[in-house]
A protein has these predicted regions:
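Cleavable N-terminal export/targeting peptides
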Residues: 1-43
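Subset of outer-membrane beta-barrel
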Residues: 26-354
Length: 354
């Protein structure tokens, strides 16, 4: 046990400092030369940084230090999947985002072998339908443009994840994903009333991105520390415009506050989740969430995804149900997030485990 503990601690600190260095490097900064800037609109494929899962969204998406994860952990910290209870888990969530952007998320994870720790393997999918838009072309007329039908942008990410626990306190995991985005086709030159279309361009692109992370149970009550880095990828180009993916580095803690009281832990649970997030294209901020669970069946949740940042996104809240039936663990989740002048966003999720 001591050997496992020493190994876990060494791995934790090695990965922490390694990823911190790489995060600075991909941003073109070093800890000694960083200049304070207002980081906005510096990345593409932003759908990769949108939190879709209903349970996660309800607690402010502070999921980095989740110890006993599920297949949905691949979207936050793949290492949490290493302690997945049972052998199989599947989950799906739908979300109608701002401007009626339709998100669909699905994941499946399974533990191969029987009685041996071969880790956990998972497959994940995120699909986005941005709806239908009018296609216009600049022209020398009174309006300055003419309409040329419609187009429907889409985006998708398909991932393959793996996680493995070492002992009962440490787990590491990674997720490799193919990312696609199709913004339709467009005309590369303006339309002149006396001329015509010179060329067209196809604005679709694909690339490979990598996520990885670790979780570590400290041994102090149920306190867990986690770290993840998401969306590592090379620079992308649309015709002439270059952009990066939304690289994000996170470190978080989680704990059941009931451990600090005399309350019966079999009846009640109050999970505290806190993440510190450093995105490539947004200000550093804190994510915060609380989840109260009664008898491992009914959960009430609340949180902030951008605590301390002046943005339209506000408080999130939600609820969940868990029930065992014939050996299956069945669950349903709902989340509500206030986006100020943009209205509210709802998420509905279902899951099943065996």
């Amino acid at each position: 046990m001591k050997k496992h503990t020493k190994f876990s601690a060494l791995m934790f600190f090695a990965l922490f400092f390694g990823v911190a260095s790489m995060s600075y490097g991909q941003a073109g900064l070093t800890p000694d030369t960083e200049v304070e800037t207002d980081k906005r609109a510096q990345t593409g494929m932003k759908f990769l940084s949108t939190s879709v899962d209903a349970r996660a969204a309800a607690i402010g998406s502070a999921m980095t230090a989740e110890l006993t994860g599920t297949s949905t952990s691949m979207f936050y910290n793949p290492a949490s999947m290493g302690f997945m209870p049972g052998r199989i888990h599947a989950g799906a969530t739908v979300m109608s985002f701002i401007a009626d952007f339709a998100y669909t998320q699905a994941s499946v994870a399974f533990r191969p072998g029987s009685g041996k720790n071969y880790g956990v393997v998972g497959v994940s999918l995120v699909s986005v339908d941005y709806g239908e838009f009018n296609h216009t072309i600049r022209a020398n007329n009174e309006q300055g443009f003419i309409e040329n039908g419609t187009y429907s942008p889409t985006a998708m990410s398909i991932g393959l994840g793996y996680a493995r626990s070492f002992g009962d306190r440490f787990s590491t995991g990674a997720n490799i994903k193919m990312v696609f985005q199709d913004l339709g086709s467009g005309f590369a030159t303006s339309l002149d009333t006396d001329g015509g279309i010179a060329t067209t361009e196809d604005y679709s692109i694909s690339t490979i991105a990598l996520d990885f992370g670790i979780v570590y149970a400290t041994g102090f009550e149920s306190l867990v520390i986690g770290m993840s880095a998401r969306n590592f990828a090379g620079e992308q180009t649309y015709v002439r415009e270059r952009f990066e993916l939304p690289l994000t580095f996170q470190i978080g803690v989680a704990m059941d506050l009931v451990d600090l009281t005399t309350i019966n832990p079999d009846m009640h649970s109050i999970q505290l989740h806190v993440d510190a997030q450093r995105p490539r294209d947004f200000a550093e901020h804190v994510r915060f969430g609380l989840e109260y669970t009664l008898m491992n069946m009914v959960s009430l949740r609340g949180g902030f995804e951008q605590l301390g940042v002046s943005e339209e996104q506000g408080f999130s809240a939600g609820a969940g149900l868990r029930y065992e039936l014939g050996g299956f663990r069945i669950g349903a989740d709902y989340a509500y997030t206030d986006f100020g002048v943009f209205g509210a966003v709802s998420r509905i999720g279902l899951q099943v485990g065996l």
